[in-house]
Regions:
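Extended, small-residue-rich solenoid/repeat segments and analogous flexible loops
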Residues: 1-56, 139-151
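Residue-level marker of intrinsically disordered, low-complexity segments enriched
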Residues: 2, 7-9, 48, 75, ...
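Glycine-rich hexapeptide-repeat left-handed beta-helix
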Residues: 60, 65-110, 115
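A general boundary/transition motif marking the beginning of the first structured unit of a protein
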Residues: 3-4, 101, 105, 125
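Intrinsically disordered, low-complexity regions enriched in Ser/Thr/Pro/Gly and simple repeats
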Residues: 17, 26, 107, 111, ...
Length: 151
């Protein structure tokens, strides 16, 4: 995992200020950035422009991506929705062969998400929606994220 450059850190710091409407804040513009292997764990990238960035191998564990422009970004990122009881967008990333999900207030692994859905919703209508999403994530993983050799 590579450390962020000084410039990348400054962009994220200005973005954090922008999110809080603080002086000196500016929306992150990381269009086309080479973020391969970057440690973006827990970064708040809400509404950031990441269009066309290379995120292969980046650590996105816990990263908040709601509203981010990910069009053309390369990496193991999936977003879809709205789903479930809160009609939230689900954000799915895969790092180090582990799938992570952020949906509403939930953040954890696919296994933890599956257990939480069963515990909270069982076979209710929302449980069925979430279980369909889980199957979609598994199918997407099998079809798109299994062959790391091509990256």
């Amino acid at each position: 995992m590579r450390e962020l450059t000084k410039k990348e850190i400054e962009i994220l710091q200005r973005h954090a200020k922008w999110l809080k409407n603080e002086e000196g804040g500016e929306r992150a513009d990381l269009r086309g950035a080479d973020l391969r292997g970057a440690d973006l764990q827990d970064a708040n990238l809400r509404d950031a422009n990441i269009r066309g960035s290379n995120l292969r191998g980046a650590n996105l564990r816990g990263a908040y991506l709601r509203g981010s422009d990910l069009q053309g970004a390369a990496g193991k990122i999936l977003s879809f929705g709205s789903i479930g009881s809160r009609q939230e967008i689900a954000y799915v990333t895969k790092t180090e062969q582990i799938i992570h999900i952020r949906c509403g207030c939930f953040y954890g692994t696919l296994k933890e998400f599956t257990a939480k859905v069963e515990e909270e919703h069982g076979d209710s209508q929302y449980g069925k929606f979430y279980k369909a999403a889980i199957e979609f994530i598994k199918a997407h993983d099998a079809a798109c994220w299994q062959d790391d050799a091509e990256e």
